[in-house]
């Protein structure tokens, strides 16, 4: 329902953002910043598979949106020297959709399924023998005369990505030989990421300017790259194209993104709890009515980061604004 353009949203990129994102996306593991536990493990797994001449084990990547699951899938395929075919769970409506992709894979190729938790049960059933035995079971005909035939598939790697690992069925989850969780990024890692992005886009960005962007990026590369693009516009008009501390702070203030990465929607929610409901507890329906949003928007879009950062607590009686929330507004955000 929500129809607002939030800079701190982790929503999928629009077409223009996606074009820029592809230009700045790292291609190799040695360019991949942060997630050192993932990078070190994948380096070993990839090297071992290449030495044996095998396809890499099936890989499940999970974690919050915007942390680079698609980027990692592309890096894995590049490091393995294989093709990557890309699709998503909602797109694969029929078993035949998946069969068409699987039968066109070359040996050791990778198939990337984003939002794999949204696969239909019918399509998921096709995946089981494909992942385990590199075989495709296809039903020919209908009714009493229907028969099953098996097609051999070349060894391949399935790379699944999801924000909801808990929504995967056990049979599917258990067929992934490698499971990697992506964590939120530290401020130093985000500074490194945005500095690299600025170099790729030929934008002058100072170290302190990068720090200001990193502080407001909610631990998420997708957000920091989006902020960089918008601050660039401000810098070109107000700062001769250079992004330093002063320009970064002024631009982000104009864009209503404060030093903890909260935007006007976050502030609106927190101030409603504090001012209209004396800090809570307040039920979700009352809160939704107070700020003019749907309860699903609050639950799925606004609340997760505020809870994670300790601004809100969920209780059996409703939402409560924490001391951290009060302090945030006392100190001016």
Curated annotation (Swiss-Prot):
Any single GO BP term: DNA repair
Reaction equation(s) it catalyzes: ATP + H2O = ADP + phosphate + H(+)
Which residues of this UniProt protein bind Mg(2+)?
70
Q: Known InterPro entries for this protein?
A: AAA+_ATPase (IPR003593), AAA_lid_4 (IPR041445), DNA_helicase_Holl-junc_RuvB (IPR004605), P-loop_NTPase (IPR027417), RuvB-like_N (IPR008824), RuvB_C (IPR008823), WH-like_DNA-bd_sf (IPR036388), WH_DNA-bd_sf (IPR036390)
Task: Identify the SUPFAM superfamilies for this entry.
Answer: P-loop containing nucleoside triphosphate hydrolases, Winged helix' DNA-binding domain
Q: Name one GO cellular component term.
A: cytoplasm
Localization recorded for this chain is: Cytoplasm
- Alphabetically list the UniProt keywords: ATP-binding, Cytoplasm, DNA damage, DNA recombination, DNA repair, DNA-binding, Hydrolase, Nucleotide-binding
Q: Where is this region: Small ATPAse domain (RuvB-S)?
A: 186-256
Its EC number is: 3.6.4.-
Asked whether the keyword DNA damage is assigned, the reply is: yes
- Coiled-coil segments, which residues? none
Binding sites annotated in the UniProt record for ATP: 24-25, 66, 69-71, 132-134, 175, 185, 222
Q: Where is this region: Head domain (RuvB-H)?
A: 259-333
Q: Which Pfam families match?
A: AAA_lid_4, RuvB_C, RuvB_N
Cystine crosslinks: none
Q: Which residues bind DNA?
A: 295, 314, 319
Name a GO molecular-function annotation.
Answer: four-way junction DNA binding
Residue ranges of the region described as Large ATPase domain (RuvB-L):
4-185
Present the record's domain note.
Has 3 domains, the large (RuvB-L) and small ATPase (RuvB-S) domains and the C-terminal head (RuvB-H) domain. The head domain binds DNA, while the ATPase domains jointly bind ATP, ADP or are empty depending on the state of the subunit in the translocation cycle. During a single DNA translocation step the structure of each domain remains the same, but their relative positions change.
Q: Which family does it belong to?
A: Belongs to the RuvB family.
NCBIfam families hit by this protein: PRK00080.1 (NF000868), ruvB (TIGR00635)
On subunit structure and binding partners, the annotation says: Homohexamer. Forms an RuvA(8)-RuvB(12)-Holliday junction (HJ) complex. HJ DNA is sandwiched between 2 RuvA tetramers; dsDNA enters through RuvA and exits via RuvB. An RuvB hexamer assembles on each DNA strand where it exits the tetramer. Each RuvB hexamer is contacted by two RuvA subunits (via domain III) on 2 adjacent RuvB subunits; this complex drives branch migration. In the full resolvosome a probable DNA-RuvA(4)-RuvB(12)-RuvC(2) complex forms which resolves the HJ.
What function does this protein fulfil? The RuvA-RuvB-RuvC complex processes Holliday junction (HJ) DNA during genetic recombination and DNA repair, while the RuvA-RuvB complex plays an important role in the rescue of blocked DNA replication forks via replication fork reversal (RFR). RuvA specifically binds to HJ cruciform DNA, conferring on it an open structure. The RuvB hexamer acts as an ATP-dependent pump, pulling dsDNA into and through the RuvAB complex. RuvB forms 2 homohexamers on either side of HJ DNA bound by 1 or 2 RuvA tetramers; 4 subunits per hexamer contact DNA at a time.
Q: What's the protein here called?
A: Holliday junction branch migration complex subunit RuvB
| Gene that encodes it | ruvB
């Amino acid at each position: 329902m929500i129809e607002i353009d939030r800079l701190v949203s982790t929503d999928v990129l629009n077409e223009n953002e996606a074009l820029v994102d592809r230009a700045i996306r790292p291609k190799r593991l040695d360019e991949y910043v942060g997630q050192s536990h993932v990078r070190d493990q994948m380096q070993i797994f990839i090297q071992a598979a290449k030495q044996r001449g095998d396809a890499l084990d099936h890989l499940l990547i999970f974690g919050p949106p915007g942390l680079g699951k698609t980027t990692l899938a592309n890096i894995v395929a590049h490091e393995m020297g294989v093709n990557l075919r890309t699709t998503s769970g909602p797109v694969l409506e029929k078993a035949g959709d998946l069969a068409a992709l699987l039968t066109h894979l070359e040996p050791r190729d990778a198939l990337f399924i984003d939002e794999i938790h949204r696969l239909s049960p019918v399509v998921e059933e096709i995946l089981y023998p494909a992942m385990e035995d590199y075989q495709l079971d296809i039903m020919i005909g209908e009714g009493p005369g229907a028969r099953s035939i098996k097609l051999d598939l070349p060894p391949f790697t399935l790379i699944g990505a999801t924000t909801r690992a808990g929504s995967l069925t056990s049979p599917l989850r258990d067929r992934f030989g490698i499971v990697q969780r992506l964590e939120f990024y530290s401020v130093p890692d985000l500074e490194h990421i945005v500095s690299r992005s600025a170099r790729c886009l030929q934008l002058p960005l100072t170290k302190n300017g990068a720090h200001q962007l990193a502080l407001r990026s909610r631990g998420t590369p997708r957000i920091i790259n989006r902020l960089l693009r918008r601050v660039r516009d401000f810098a070109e008009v107000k700062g001769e194209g250079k992004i330093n501390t002063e320009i970064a702070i002024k631009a982000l203030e104009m864009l209503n993104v404060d030093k903890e990465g909260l935007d006007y929607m976050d502030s609106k929610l927190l101030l409603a709890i504090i001012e209209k409901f004396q800090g809570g507890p307040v039920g979700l329906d009352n809160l939704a009515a107070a700020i003019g949003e749907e309860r699903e928007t609050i639950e799925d879009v606004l609340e997760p980061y505020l809870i994670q950062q300790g601004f809100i607590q969920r209780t059996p009686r409703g939402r409560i604004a924490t001391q951290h929330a009060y302090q945030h507004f006392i100190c001016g955000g």
